[in-house]
Amino acid sequence: MKIIVDMMGGDNAPLAVLEGTAQAVKEYGVQVIGVGSEELVRKTAAEHNIPLDGIELVNCTETIEMCDEPARAIRSKKESSIVVGLNLLKEGKGDAFVSAGSTGALHVGASLIVRTLKGVKRPALATMVPAKNKAYLLLDCGANVECRPEMLAAFAVMGSCYVNRVEGRTAPTVALANNGAEESKGTPMLREAHQLLKATPGIRFVGNIEPRDVPNGDVDVVVCDGFTGNVILKLTEGVAKMLLGMLKEMFLANLGGKIAYLLLKSGVGSLKHQMDSEEYGGAPFLGAKQPVIKAHGSSKAKGIKNAIRQAKICVENDLCGTMQSALDELTTSQAD
């Protein structure tokens, strides 16, 4: 198996990407095609004593910056690491693509270069979000700001396949993010989506879920448009950061707090581990014909390594093939 990795993507590239890639090669036994500035990658590897065993480098002369307009960048920067990597994936030179680069460019590239599964207009960005009972899959979390009901039905089908195949959960539950639990709640689009999801084959739709209940982790998949999903994701990240910061201040405030921290150290460590997004890897663009994984822009080595692990699981379990079969069933049911 070969995983294509963007060596230039993210705030900590290429060092963190190199470290995470080398760890993944060693731990997971994958082969990697690293796309980026070969000179810079080799120099960084030499300076930090990072082995390049199992990593084939493909030189790129351009980089897509976060400030670049996504569609224009994909069309004009043909020698960028993202475009080169996605083309290698399309040509069958690798089995999946991992990048911590521009989300917008990856979304456009996944649509225009890799192309989408039949029945999918545009790929949905999905991510596992830490929660109280168990992490849940949130999609769309930023790629498609406006969605039609049929798109949300496709998201539900693909999300169920992902949680089943990658997370190993049988018969995952699906909920629609809304401002109330009743069927009558929400905009006309959400009310129509609710009825469509009730009739969608192959998923366990449990109805609407209110934002206050999402962090409990009572469902496996939360479906919404990209605007709503991005707000949920960023609010969750902000609240988690605030609470951990408040705990730290409380423990360091006085001697009693420091003693309490020593007694609760293992529990606090478990909480931080549970809330660490890097443990879950990256965010897949569900609906692309082949696995495209977006690692967090601030990913360190652990995040990159886990994103590669995630890509490996997607390939091993034929995620894209499974999603296409489920989408075909959805299309047939909608035509009846």
Feature roles, as predicted:
Residues V5-P14, A143-A153, K294-A301:
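Short, glycine-rich nucleotide/cofactor-binding loops
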